[in-house]
Amino acid sequence: MTKTFFELIQVAIGTRICLSQTPSADEWGELYAMAKKQSLVGVCFAGVQRLQQQRQELPEMLYLTWLGMAAKIQQRNEVVDQQCKELWNVLHKAGLDAAVMKGQAIGCYYGELSQLRLSGDIDVWVKGGFDTVNEYIQRTVPSDDIAYHRFHYNVYSDTEVELHHRPTLMRNLFDNKKLQRWCDGVTPDEFIVNRKGFAMPPARFDRIFILTHIYAHFLFSGIGLRQIMDYYFLLKNTSASEDEEMLLKQFRLTRFAGAMMWLLKDKFGLENDKLICDPIEDEGRYLLREVEYSGNFGHSDERFRGFSTLRKMTQRGAHLLWHYPSEVIWTPIWLVYHKFWKREHRNKVYNVRKKFA
């Protein structure tokens, strides 16, 4: 990614007034391609509009293409926001303590750029554990598509929905136990009903949770700048809690957090007083290279194209072992553990489903 692309991002998010030089027509085309790869077409269009006021304009046809894409993103956000509101209200009326996580919830921190963030699926954390979520799902829209932390819940034909009985996980079983204990400590009383009409977790939770989510995708599939930007807006618009430094150490996130802080400070312009820890430049530059390869959730990574899922995971793990050994080394053990976990809990799914057949 070029210096100019990061300048465009900074213009879009308000940490820069204009580009250091006006791009040529070809360079504008490259900027649009980078924005698409990183799933930032909508947010970057806000930068394009601001640059027009500075007389740094792009070719008309590209502008119209970009405008059309941004309009579609806005329309899609309206749909997904409404689905989040509807789903949360249904869960709430059913007596479940639920909060929308990630995606549309994090979008609330984007301010006026909220509707330009590219939406994805809907993730809802339902407190009460596996049995509570399982019984609700089998009673309403039955599903046996389960994992350690979530069910697929096929309630919308055009939007993927996951109901989480755990918000997230770590593959190191000891670290995961600590993480689950910490997640359990977040009470439904802390959930916040936002201006869009659905509940979301408190900022103190999101500041650690979103980092673990990005970390997991970075290790096992890849991340793009959209995920980095989510964390930028979250940190920019929230305040630190007293136990953050301890939690970073406890979950072995200090090195990755340092990499993220370098990237957010150097490339996004996040202020020093908003950083969650000290930046680590070497790790940050390594992270940036991986982001350049991967694109959004690793969809643009050509290095492992055509590999089986297992081989891709093995190759990527070997690639990252030196930097983040704990999660990588624990992966084979985790996969065996998860296989037996799924076997046991799928039986629970079928037993509950029989009750409502």
Feature-to-residue mapping (PLM):
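Conserved NTP-donor binding/palm subdomain of two-metal-ion nucleotidyltransferases/polymerases, i.e.
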Residues: M1-G120, W125-A357
